[in-house]
């Protein structure tokens, strides 16, 4: 929705000029692809690019039932998968992670170096016992879970960028007021450490 909204909003246009005009930087590229062709699409882009990239992010469907997802995942360097405390979603996430891990153990030559889970949309009203119970299960299965927990919040569901602070945007960083309490900065820092980007 962003390009259409920017065309209608002088404030966002000015912000865009301020962010990219003065620095000479460009917005990062977003490529559309299918899970089957994701890695090849990125490879072709990187070959033609004049820039060197430290990091390429892939946003894949959250189920291995979509054609190409499993093959794409095992050909990544690292996978970070969100988990929620909702029972059916948790079962699906656990099946996904365990299937990937089993494949990694049987095929040592795959590029995938690690799969890490992180808590997403954590509702503070949910019992700590549930969270602690799942954490114990993950430990017993030796499944890595990031320390950072992303809380459940309305700001993830919609964006008030037309009138209020930006949060969900591919062109602008989240405003400091919208970032407060989101833990996204902590998540990014933890991922940077795992990927040795710092």
Spell out what each predicted region is.
Residues 158-185:
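C-terminal boundary of histidine-terminating zinc-finger modules
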Residues 121-168:
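Beta-strand-loop-alpha "switch" segments that mediate conformational coupling across diverse proteins
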Residues 67-87:
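Inter-motif core of Ras-like GTPase G domains
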Residues 58, 81, 117-119:
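Structural beta-sheet core signal
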Residues 1-57, 62, 161:
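P-loop/Walker-type NTP enzyme "switch/lid" segment
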Residues 7-8, 63-65, 87-89, 103, ...:
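Catalytic P-loop NTPase motifs of RecA-like helicase/translocase cores
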Residues 93-109:
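Conserved C-terminal guanine-recognition region of P-loop GTPase G domains, centered on the G4
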């Amino acid at each position: 929705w962003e390009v259409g909204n920017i065309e209608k909003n002088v404030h966002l246009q000015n912000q865009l000029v301020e962010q990219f005009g003065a620095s000479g930087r460009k917005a990062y590229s977003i490529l559309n692809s299918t899970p089957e062709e994701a890695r090849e699409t990125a490879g072709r882009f990187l070959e033609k690019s004049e820039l060197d990239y430290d990091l390429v992010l892939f946003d894949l469907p959250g189920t291995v039932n979509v054609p190409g997802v499993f093959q794409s995942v095992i050909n990544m360097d690292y996978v970070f998968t969100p988990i929620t405390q909702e029972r059916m979603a948790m079962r699906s996430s656990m099946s996904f992670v365990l299937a990937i891990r089993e494949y990694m153990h049987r095929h040592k030559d795959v590029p995938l170096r690690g799969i890490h889970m992180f808590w997403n949309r954590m509702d503070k009203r949910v019992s700590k016992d549930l969270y602690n119970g799942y954490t114990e299960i993950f430990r017993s299965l030796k499944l890595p879970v990031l320390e950072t927990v992303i809380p459940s919040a309305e700001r993830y569901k919609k964006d008030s960028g037309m009138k209020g602070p930006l949060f969900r945007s591919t062109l602008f960083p989240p405003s400091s007021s919208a970032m407060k309490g989101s833990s996204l900065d902590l998540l990014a820092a933890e991922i940077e450490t795992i990927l040795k980007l710092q």
